[in-house]
């Protein structure tokens, strides 16, 4: 959230953040963080309050939940605002497995949210876990098409899948739109900064809200994230400190 909010603000998007879990740090590189859990009742209460006050949303972005018990309350929240576009990043794993604090039951809980997603934003690992497809570091176009079609059948209207090896560059970004796959070839940098996905998502959804196509939006998101990674490496920033976005926010104005 700390990477997304500045991005949205700079791009002229007013955000209304609703926390699902509060952590003293992210879950990688700082040991066990202090955690404050948000109750399902709070999420539902927010929805009821906004409805009472006639608050409207152009888009609802669903990101890190951290607790499978929140899935039903998130569905309730979405149902209260049927005119909003729903974008869902099912944050739960990478490198072929669940993050250490999640398991298959968490994945099943997140599956319940797929039907409400106008746009689903998993990485390759998350797309395999949700589709029930064996993960591999190299997947053919046929494999990727099957994964996309499975997620589409589960209810996702459109997909953008990140961290996809395609045999020509180390990681690409896949767009699945109207039954067609488009690959954006990217160059991989030798670092994995925390918060990269949040920055990518922020630029992506802001670009969509400003009227850009999905392809244009993901190109702009990648351009910004790549520049931030270059700056972070240049400054010899620790990966656990997260992606350094501040010096590149001007790119989004």
What residue ranges belong to the model's regions?
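Conserved phosphate/ATP/ADP-binding segment of small-molecule kinases
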Residues: 101-181, 191
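Short, small-residue alpha-helix embedded
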Residues: 129, 191-214, 218
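Short beta-strands and strand-loop turn motifs
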Residues: 59-62, 87-95, 121-130, 161, ...
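Conserved N-terminal subdomain of the carbohydrate kinase-like
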Residues: 1-100, 246-252
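Glycine-rich beta-alpha junction loops
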Residues: 21-23, 66, 92-94, 126, ...
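Charged C-terminal helix
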Residues: 215-253
């Amino acid at each position: 959230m700390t990477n997304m909010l500045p991005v949205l603000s700079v791009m002229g998007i007013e955000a209304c953040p609703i926390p699902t879990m509060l952590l003293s740090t992210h879950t990688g590189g700082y040991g066990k963080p202090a955690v404050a859990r948000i109750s399902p009742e709070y999420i539902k209460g927010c929805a009821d309050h906004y409805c009472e006050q006639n608050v409207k949303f152009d888009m609802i972005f669903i990101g890190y939940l951290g607790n499978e018990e929140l899935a039903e309350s998130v569905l309730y929240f979405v149902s209260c605002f049927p005119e909003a576009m729903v974008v869902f990043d099912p944050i739960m794993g990478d490198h072929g497995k669940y993050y250490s604090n999640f398991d298959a039951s968490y994945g099943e809980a997140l599956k319940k949210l797929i039907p409400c997603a106008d746009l689903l934003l998993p990485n390759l690992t998350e797309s395999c876990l949700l589709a029930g497809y064996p993960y591999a570091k190299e997947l053919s176009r046929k494999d990727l098409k099957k994964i996309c079609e499975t997620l589409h059948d589960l209810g996702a209207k459109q997909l953008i899948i990140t961290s996809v090896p395609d045999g020509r560059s180390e990681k690409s970004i896949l767009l699945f739109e109207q039954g067609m796959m488009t690959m954006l070839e990217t160059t991989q940098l030798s670092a994995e900064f925390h918060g990269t996905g949040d920055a990518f998502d922020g630029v992506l959804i802001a670009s969509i809200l400003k009227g850009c196509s999905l392809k244009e939006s993901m190109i702009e998101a990648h351009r910004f994230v790549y520049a931030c990674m270059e700056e972070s490496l240049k400054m010899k920033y620790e990966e656990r400190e997260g992606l350094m976005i501040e010096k590149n926010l001007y790119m989004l104005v």
